[in-house]
Amino acid sequence: MALTTLNIKEPGLNVLPPGVERYVVEGGGLTGIQILPDDEIEIINNEGNQICEVSVFNKDGKSELAILSLKEIRDNSEIKKILLKKDETSLQALLQLKKRKLNIEKSKSSVIFDKETKAGESIKLKSKDKCYCIFAAPGNQMMVHEQNPSTELTIMVTRAEIKREKEFTIIPD
């Protein structure tokens, strides 16, 4: 029997294969993701010209970029700037990092992409160990006469091991 559009349960819904997760880093914001050993991470620069700053913490909460084979470039000034804003989402993110006992003050970061990056360009990374990663899409407020908004990044995580545990079946709040 041929598949037809009648078989589509939710039109427009992008269905990912098992073990693949999609995260969006909003322009000017950040996203934290728990990464496990041998997970593959693809960072996609959707619209181009967007810098991506990455900070990685090992299972002990210490900054360790080598887990993703990244080199230290700066002491994560852009991530710190985003976290030190006094808006509600920044305060929530800072609280979550403190709950995880991650020392953001002493953390280092690496910069992926630059202002010359083409739209759709991506980079793939592979985790060597369990870690918590913070991905940021930093940028200044848009100047009307320059048309320079920060844009979103897409993070695709392909899990090395697909878990069917109860904690992964519950939708978070």
Where are the regions a protein language model picked out?
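Acidic, Ser/Thr/Pro
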Residues: M1-D173
